[in-house]
Amino acid sequence: QSSNRYFENCGERSLGQFLSVSFLVAYYILPQYFGIRLPGFDLTAQRMLITILCLFLLSKESRKKMFWEGVRSCRLWLFMAGYLGICFYTAVLRFHIGTFLYPFIELLGAFLVIYVLREYLGSDGFLVLFRRMLLFLCVLGLVEAVMRKTPFAYLETIRGLYTGGMIRSGSYRIMGPANHSLAYGLILISGLPLLCIDEEKHCFTLFRHLPLLLLVVVNVFLTGSRSTLAVMGLELLLLTVLAPGEQRKKLLFTIVPAGLLI
């Protein structure tokens, strides 16, 4: 009986890890126009995985308990509750359930990310997965720059959400899985600090994954977004300040002059 319980727990653990990885891949990589159109509601790939993961949580009391502990321990939940309250108030005034439902789904997705990171992947496992996803996006970004069309467009199953290519001053602006070049730029710069984490030394370093960092920088340039470039420059400066002493000096003598030239 104990051996059966052991294999059962191992099976549940493996299933949880598989769903966690699938959820994060869908959440970070797959476009919003990949899914199923239902009357009054688009069931995107992200929402499918959110639904499946929620059913997995609800199927066992211990998993529900761990999820709610993560929600309660989140320091931003008061601000999130206030935001949801405003959305609910707006939904009542507009008589449209989507005004409340869509922000609720986004917040639920954020809490699920916290849950799978704590319970199934851990910080090291999450960072390894994240770097692989970022590498995948950046390589496809280079392919898109050559094709002048995002490869994710071939996943369009919900018609009307894909906006097509973006061209400014004759130059094509890559957009990845997003619907706008600016949105893709935000995806890239939001992951930049995570890319520079050194798990072994527990510090920030720009040299830990330098080839991938350069790919991210090139992709940000190819988005053609000046605001995104400015934010990326600020991020690199802050990461330089947070780097170890000797590395900080080297970076200040290279990144700062390069930034001024750009």
Predicted feature descriptions by range:
Residues L38-L43, Q247-I262:
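Alpha-helical transmembrane segments and terminal signal-anchor/GPI-anchor hydrophobic tails
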Residues I29-P39, Y162-P177:
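Juxtamembrane membrane-water interface segments that cap and precede transmembrane helices
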Residues D42-K60, L101-L112, Y184-L192, L229-L237:
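Membrane-embedded alpha-helical segments of multi-pass membrane proteins
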Residues L78-G82, F95-E119:
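Aromatic-anchored transmembrane helix interface
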Residues V128-E156, S169, G176-G224, T228-L242:
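Alpha-helical transmembrane segments of multi-pass inner-membrane proteins
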Residues C10-F23, M66-M80, F126-F130, T205-H209:
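Membrane-interfacial loop-to-transmembrane alpha-helix junctions, especially the N-terminal start
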Residues Q1-R63, G85-T90:
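N-terminal signal-anchor transmembrane segment
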